[in-house]
UniProtKB/Swiss-Prot annotation:
The lineage of its organism: Bacteria, Pseudomonadati, Pseudomonadota, Alphaproteobacteria, Rickettsiales. One of its GO terms (cellular component) is cytoplasm. Residues 12-27 have a biased composition (Basic and acidic residues). This is Antigenic heat-stable 120 kDa protein. Residues 347-372, 379-396 have a biased composition (Polar residues). It is found in: Cytoplasm. It holds the Pfam family 120_Rick_ant. Residues 1-34, 347-396 are annotated as: Disordered. The gene is sca4.
Length: 1010
């Protein structure tokens, strides 16, 4: 608490005045005799008519409040004690800033002090800003400054008490308190305080507590036994009489006696006249730092002054009530948490503790016998028996020291001294860490501490761990991380309060000069891990926001700040949080880092990549959900499903993501479709639609290489699906069909092979899928070749007036050669007519087109199948002839008509793996072989079998007994044939030919509709 340093006067001291004041202080300290009032309790009262009106300033904010007044006593305390102490403190802070490594921060704080001095000489804003606490605490560590502050306090109170004493003639001035013992109890005393008019203002009650000794630790680690202290029931509200009142109660030594008269220490309560004339508690003056011998409301206050321990006549609970009343009477809203913050600040030393000396004597105490003013403690004459649940035997470091729970019953400083003593003695880092964990557990399990005090104590423990010189760097990391783990596992601390502890711990770590950046990063990462493990998103967000702000405001170099933010982002990125929450947290870290200019371009790019990946994962998840909704919609048929999934595919391709991310999403789409429970043909149609959508997508928004990349991902999704291999083969085929129907180039088709190669399946499955892909490509190329041939059909180049583009092209050629023809005619050389020239040139063009088409198709095959899986046209022709011969030979092995008919259906009609041309050529050859040899040998004789089948010949029954056997008008040689079987086979062959010729190769296998 800095209340004793708050600006409470507007007076600016000149150098001469400062020297005079210092001289007065030295004189006061050198006095061998002093008035009796200095070492006694005293009070001063004034009536309303006597109080002087001076500007009053808030004890908390330091702002002048014109509506309130302050009497001369309060003003004197401010001017002779508080302001000189603040001046010396600022002087030390400026010295510390001059030596600070972070020159930017040092200059910023120096300017802050200088600029505020011009507006407010008391620097109320600076001292009231929690961000400046570390500079104040560091200055207070200076031994010379502490001596100065103590001397100012002693001399100042002497001056005030002497100046405003009744003995010096000051009306209503300070006078000793006349305590009167209660007859019924010698440890109870009381006194009535009256104003100068004789009206009672209040009755003060004093209770002396005599107890068996308990131990308090000093800053140097030595311990002092307290056997007696007192409590005074300071009034909170006064409503009896008018006037002002100042109660100045001397602090007692450790044995309960008053201090020597040359070093009195006072706790003063200032009650000033309020608007209704009644005294109001406006201010409390006490030495700094004020501590409490326990965590409950009944814990007694004590201070260390001049190397000695003094107890003050106020408990923690009473002090809380008094501070809340001060807030009320200063016109501020009452907030319990704010009041407790102030109390905790005064109750705990922020100064770096020293190691407790090893020669410390055994100090164990037992609970006081009166009202239990302090927590239960062990009697002096009994050995310490720590609870095993709090401190296992293996963790005991010094039997002459208190355990953590007992040490904490005194004060946080006692606990730190105990821990430091153990860390000094114990060289095993594991046992050192166990001791730190034990202390953290004791702090959080202390039922008498409120959450604010627990926060402050945990932070103090972390700071102590970081700064302890007996811990190796790795042990410091492990120690702080152990504290963070204790925070994580504590079941009683609310998540938002845990978040504050984590943030404060990171601030201590990052601003420490005793750690390397690597060690700081390890502790920061642990804090982030703990923060991300909190159970609600608000606490997680608060932790990350707080930590990133701490990083940016730390005294680290800019480069190190960027590294720390990257570490925060990495932890968020690898966490198990939802993608939506990751997006929010990582986005906020990136945004803050860019705004604060602590992230390098490379770091920004790296974090943006992580953010893009998370965004892609979320997009992928959302997309697949939509796809599943479509697939399992019972009201939509396959055609509608295909249309809707094509629309989703198109949206993905148009999205802002990279081609790689788009490929990942498309892969998930095809994988989801392939793995669905739909019929194989239904899945095939949907996949075909996806392939066609990719192939036909605008080249301006999606380049050809990116299309190929995405198409490979589409096939990979199919290949890696859990459906059976035949279904995957079918979907691979129709994916290729979709590419061709979408006019996709060979690069897109070739990408299908790449997708198969990159898939995580076994080699045999890869080979099967490649064959399916090549078969689809073969069929597509055959269609293209056939379409090219069909385009030439009907172009009778012998006609005098050819039509279509070929004729027009030939006409262009003739127009070009006409001048040559005319020149030849003039030379009277024989020439051909124009029409003949057209025919010749057209024939030449068609020959060239045919050659180019063959060459183009062969090149295309080579490109699509670099491994030679697709054959050239010449190779395909040879293969077709060979296959036809094999089929004809196989047919000849079938002896019965039924076997031959079955062969025709199975091998020529149903087997679609054979090309259309091979099957038709086989049928033609089989039909030729059905003709009789005599007819074949005599080409001039028309065989009747053709006319019979075509219906041009009239057949008559051979006999009345067999009317179904008709007489065939045909020449029969010496080897007679089975006329009836022959006719059936020829009919079956011609029927098969009709079926094959009617096949529509431009459409895939018909799909089942729902």
């Amino acid at each position: 608490d800095t209340s004793e340093f708050d600006p409470l006067a507007n007076k600016e001291y000149t150098e001469e005045q400062k020297q005079t004041l210092e001289q007065e202080q030295k004189e006061f300290l050198s006095q061998t005799t002093t008035p009796a009032l200095e070492a006694d309790d005293g009070f001063i009262v004034t009536s309303a008519s006597f109080a002087q009106s001076t500007p009053s300033m808030s004890v908390l904010s330091g702002n002048i409040s014109p509506s309130q007044t302050s009497d001369p006593i309060t003003k004197a305390v401010r001017e002779t004690i508080i302001q000189p102490q603040k001046d010396n403190l600022i002087e030390q802070i400026l010295k510390d800033l001059a030596a600070l490594t972070d020159r930017d921060l040092a200059e910023q704080k120096r300017k802050e002090i200088e600029e505020e001095k011009e507006k407010d000489k008391t620097l109320s804003t600076f001292f009231g800003n929690p961000a400046n606490r570390e500079f104040i605490d560091k200055a207070l560590e200076n031994p010379e400054l502490k001596k100065k502050l103590e001397s100012i306090e002693i001399a100042g109170y002497k001056n005030v008490h002497n100046t405003f004493s009744a003995a010096s003639g000051y009306p209503g001035g300070f006078k000793p308190v006349q305590w009167e013992n209660h007859v019924s109890a010698s440890d109870l005393r009381a006194t009535v305080v009256k104003n100068d008019a004789g009206d009672e203002l209040c009755t003060l009650n004093e209770t002396t507590v005599k107890t068996k000794p308990f131990t308090l630790a000093k800053q140097d680690g030595t311990q002092v036994q307290i056997s007696s202290y007192r409590e005074i029931d300071f009034p909170i509200k006064l409503d009896k009489a008018d006037g002002s009142m100042h109660l100045s109660m001397v602090a007692l030594k450790a044995d309960g006696t008053k201090p020597s008269k040359d070093k009195p220490v006072y706790f003063t309560a200032h009650y000033e006249e309020g608007p209704n004339g009644k005294p109001q508690l406006k201010e409390i003056s006490s030495p700094k730092p004020l501590k409490f011998a326990g965590t409950g409301d009944d814990a007694i206050a004590y201070i260390e002054h001049g190397g000695e321990i003094y107890t003050l006549a106020v408990t923690r609970g009473k002090y809380k009530d008094m501070m809340k009343e001060v807030e009320l009477n200063q016109g501020q809203s009452v907030d319990l948490s704010q009041a407790e913050d102030i109390i905790i600040g005064q109750g705990q030393s922020k100064e770096q503790p020293l190691i407790t000396p090893q020669q410390t004597t055994s100090s164990s105490v037992e609970p006081p016998q009166h009202k239990q003013q302090v927590p239960p403690i062990t009697p002096t004459n009994q050995p310490l028996q720590p609870e095993t649940s709090q401190m296992p035997q293996s963790q005991q470091v010094n039997p002459n020291l208190l355990n953590t729970a007992t040490a904490l019953s005194g004060s946080m400083q006692d606990l730190l001294n105990y821990v430091n003593a153990g860390l000094t003695k114990e060289i095993d880092s594991n046992k050192q860490i166990d001791l730190i964990k034990e202390a953290a557990t004791a702090i959080l399990n202390n039922e008498k501490s409120d959450i604010v005090e627990k926060q402050a104590n945990i932070i103090a423990l972390a700071e102590n761990t970081v700064n302890n010189k007996n811990l190796k760097p790795d042990a410091k990391v492990a120690g702080v991380n152990a504290v963070l783990e204790i925070i994580k596992n504590d079941q009683n601390t609310p998540n938002l309060e845990k978040s504050k502890m984590l943030e404060a711990t990171v601030a201590i770590v990052l601003n420490s000069e005793n750690l390397e950046p690597k060690q700081k990063q390890q502790m920061l990462e642990k804090a982030v891990d703990v923060g991300l493990s909190l159970k609600d998103d608000a606490s997680r967000a608060a932790t990350i926001d707080g930590i990133k702000d701490v990083v940016i405001k730390s005294n680290l170099y800019t480069e190190d700040k960027g590294t720390m933010l990257i570490a925060v982002g990495d932890k968020v990125n690898v966490s198990e949080l939802s993608n939506a929450e990751k997006q929010k947290l990582l986005g906020s870290v990136l945004k803050k880092g860019v705004e604060a200019q602590v992230l390098s371009p490379a770091q920004q790019q790296l974090m943006q990549q992580h953010l893009d990946k998370i965004t892609a994962e979320q997009t992928k998840k959302d997309t697949i959900k939509k796809v599943n909704d479509i697939l399992f919609d019972p009201l939509s048929n396959t055609e509608l499903k295909t249309t809707n999934i094509q629309a989703i595919t198109s949206n993905v391709l148009d999205g802002p993501a990279t081609a790689e991310v788009k490929g990942e999403i498309i892969q998930e789409i095809t994988n989801t479709v392939a793995g669905s429970s739909l019929e194989a043909q239904d899945k095939a149609e949907i996949v075909k639609g996806v392939g066609e959508t990719i192939a036909t997508h605008s080249d301006t928004s999606l380049s050809l290489p990116n299309k190929a990349l995405i198409m490979a991902s589409a096939e990979k999704g199919i290949a890696e699906s859990k459906t059976n291999l035949p279904d995957r083969e079918l979907m691979t085929k129709v994916l290729v069909d979709g590419i061709y129907e979408g006019k996709g180039g060979p690069e897109i088709t070739k990408a299908v092979s790449s997708g198969i190669d990159n898939s995580n399946i076994n080699d045999s499955e890869k080979e099967a899928l490649k064959k399916a892909k090549d078969a689809a490509s073969e069929a597509a190329l055959d269609r293209d070749t056939q379409n090219l041939t069909e385009g030439f059909k009907g172009q009778n180049i012998e006609e005098h007036k050819p039509h279509d583009d070929i004729y027009n092209k030939a006409r262009e050629v003739i127009n070009a050669v006409n001048p040559v023809i005319e020149a030849l005619e003039k030379s009277k050389e024989p020439v051909v007519s124009a029409e003949e020239r057209i025919v010749q040139e057209t024939s030449s063009i068609l020959n060239n087109i045919s050659k180019l088409a063959v060459e183009k198709v062969n090149n295309l095959r080579s490109m699509l199948s670099p491994n030679g899986n697709l054959k050239t046209l010449e190779e395909k022709k040879e293969e077709s002839i060979k296959k036809v011969d094999e089929l004809v030979k196989a047919f000849g092995t079938k002896s019965s008509t039924e076997e031959q008919q079955s062969f025709i259906k199975t091998n020529l009609i149903d087997d679609k793996t054979l090309s259309k041309e091979v099957r038709l050529q086989t049928i033609d050859k089989l039909l030729q072989e059905q003709k009789r040899a005599e007819a074949i040998e005599n080409p001039s004789f028309k065989t009747e079998d053709v006319r019979v089948v075509s219906g041009k010949s009239k057949l008559k029954p051979i006999s009345k007994d067999n009317p179904d056997i008709e007489k065939a008008k045909m020449v029969v040689g010496r080897d007679r044939v089975n006329i009836k079987g022959n006719i059936k086979i020829m009919g079956a062959l011609m029927n098969a030919r009709d079926i094959i010729q009617s096949e529509n190769l431009n459409k895939s296998t018909p799909i089942k509709r729902e």
